[in-house]
Regions:
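A short hydrophobic beta-strand segment most commonly corresponding to one strand
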Residues: 63-65, 116-131
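Mixed-charge, glycine-accented linear interaction segment located at domain edges/termini
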Residues: 134-138, 142
C-alpha cells in the first residue's frame, strides 16, 4: 500500500479540478475508484482551513497520503478501562506523507487542517464505494485529562 500511495501522491495530475473542490460545511469526500467486488474504495478528501475529522478508529483497514497542503494528525491510544481514547502526540503531515492502519482501535486518530490553505489527502479504505460515508470511521469518545 505504501508504494501505491507514494506513486499516487507524486502524480500531480491525479485529480480533476472538480475533485479538488471542497465544502464550507466540512471536509468533502470525492469517490475516485471502487473495486467491483467491494474490497476497497479510493477517495480524495478536500479540507478547508479549520476543518477536521472526528476522533476515530476504523471499521476497516485504511491508508492515506497527503497530496497538497498540510494536515495535522493527532494520535490516540485506547484506554479499555475507561472506554475512552487518550491523546498521545500531534504532528504535521506534509505532502507525500503516508500512513496506514488495520481495522480496530489500534489506529485512533484525528486529521485536521489547521493551516490557512486548502489541503487534499488521498485515502484507500477496505470497504465498498457506497459504504465510505457509513462504514469507515469508528467515532470514539476522548479523555480530556
Amino acid at each position: 500500500m505504501r508504494a501505491a500511495l507514494a506513486e499516487a501522491a507524486a502524480n500531480e495530475t491525479l485529480l480533476a479540478p472538480a475533485q479538488c473542490e471542497g465544502s464550507s460545511e466540512c471536509y468533502r469526500r470525492h469517490l475516485l475508484a471502487a473495486d467491483a467486488s467491494g474490497r476497497y474504495a479510493v477517495v480524495a478528501l478536500v479540507w478547508h482551513a479549520g476543518q477536521a475529522s472526528p476522533v476515530h478508529g476504523h471499521h476497516a483497514w485504511c491508508g492515506y497520503a497527503i497530496l497538497s497542503g498540510t494536515l495535522t494528525e493527532t494520535l490516540y491510544r485506547w484506554d479499555e478501562s475507561l472506554g475512552l481514547a487518550k491523546p498521545v502526540r500531534t504532528h504535521a503531515r506534509a505532502p507525500g506523507a503516508i500512513s496506514y492502519t488495520r481495522a480496530g482501535l489500534g489506529g485512533i486518530h484525528r486529521l485536521g487542517n489547521a493551516g490557512p490553505a486548502r489541503a487534499i489527502s488521498l485515502h484507500v479504505y477496505g470497504v465498498a464505494g457506497d459504504e465510505v460515508s457509513t462504514r469507515v470511521n469508528d467515532v470514539v469518545r476522548v479523555s480530556h485529562r
